[in-house]
Design a protein with these regions (language model features):
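Sec-dependent bacterial lipoprotein signal peptides
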Residues: 1-15
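Ser/Thr-rich, Pro/Gly/Ala-heavy low-complexity intrinsically disordered linkers and tails
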Residues: 13-79
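Cysteine-rich modules of extracellular adhesion/ECM and protease-associated proteins
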Residues: 55-57, 64, 72-108
Length: 274
């Protein structure tokens, strides 16, 4: 009787201490989200070690995004990428404030230069503008440029206009005029004697190929109609009105001389709005 009671007690204790690994894996799961990721702990029972339980933690981190929705670096329309987008006044590909285009892609000033090399014109205003464009591109200058040049029906002052009344500067940052309207005032703050390469050209006597600039334009910005080499379409006969690059008075655009149409003269190239 006593032996039977003891056997029953031992069997009961053994049953109470037994745990089925398949039903008691201790598999607790959790989910913490706070903008940086999700952590999910899981348990892994190793049957070979007698039911010893280990913990594996898996973490997922969300990618860091910028205010424009990109995931590092600039994507799409960005100030400073060298391309003028619809929401920008200019974009010279840098983040420098002390130049013609501020770091915020807001225009500060317009550029002007005189071509280093002379040109014999026979293709009208289109050819002259192409000369300016090619010179600027070769020098790595951004923007759109037009030649200060008049024909019998088109005035230079109407070709060089700006949406904003901002200074016009040489490439050495010297201000030429405070706005395009001042180009017909009869004087400049500084002569347009710096080339697309930023070099000050040698100051030679007026009305020579070394110092003369094709303009066909009077001091008031209107055409000098009698001396424009057939609206800059011929290199034969006659002469074209020229300016003097060394001067800041009215002779910068009208030096009072007509140079042979076949001559190779400089051009004034002004940056304009795209």
């Amino acid at each position: 009787m006593t032996s039977s009671l003891v056997l029953a007690l031992v069997s009961g204790l053994a049953a109470a201490c037994f745990v089925d690994p398949g039903s008691g894996s201790g598999g607790a799961t959790g989910d913490a989200t706070g903008g940086t990721g999700t952590t999910s702990p899981t348990s892994d029972a190793d049957a070979s070690s007698g039911g010893t339980t280990g913990m594996t933690v898996t973490t997922t981190v969300d990618p860091v995004t910028s205010s424009d929705g990109s995931t590092g670096g600039c994507e799409g329309m960005c100030c400073g990428d060298g391309t003028v987008d619809v929401n920008e006044q200019c974009d010279d590909g840098n983040k420098v404030d002390d130049d013609f285009c501020a770091a915020s892609c807001v225009r500060v000033a317009y550029r002007v230069f005189v071509t280093k090399q002379g040109s014999v014109l026979s293709g009208g205003l289109t050819e002259a503008d192409e000369v300016c464009h090619a010179a600027a591109a070769a020098a790595g200058l951004p923007g759109v440029y037009r030649a200060w040049l008049s024909t019998s029906t088109v005035s230079a002052k109407d070709r060089v206009t700006h949406k904003q009344a901002l200074p016009i500067r040489r490439l050495d940052n010297q201000t030429v005029v405070m706005s395009a309207a001042d180009l017909v005032s009869g004087s400049l703050l500084a002569p347009i004697a710096v080339s697309e390469a930023g070099e000050l050209l040698p100051l030679m006597p007026a009305c020579t190929e070394e110092s003369a600039v094709w303009t066909g334009t009077l001091a008031n910005g209107e055409p000098n109609a009698d001396t424009n080499c057939g609206d800059w379409t011929t290199t034969m006969g006659g002469g074209g009105a020229a300016g003097f690059l060394a001067n800041a008075d009215a002779s910068w655009t009208d030096a009072g001389c007509a140079v042979a149409c076949g001559a190779s003269l400089h051009l004034y190239c002004f940056e304009v709005d795209p």
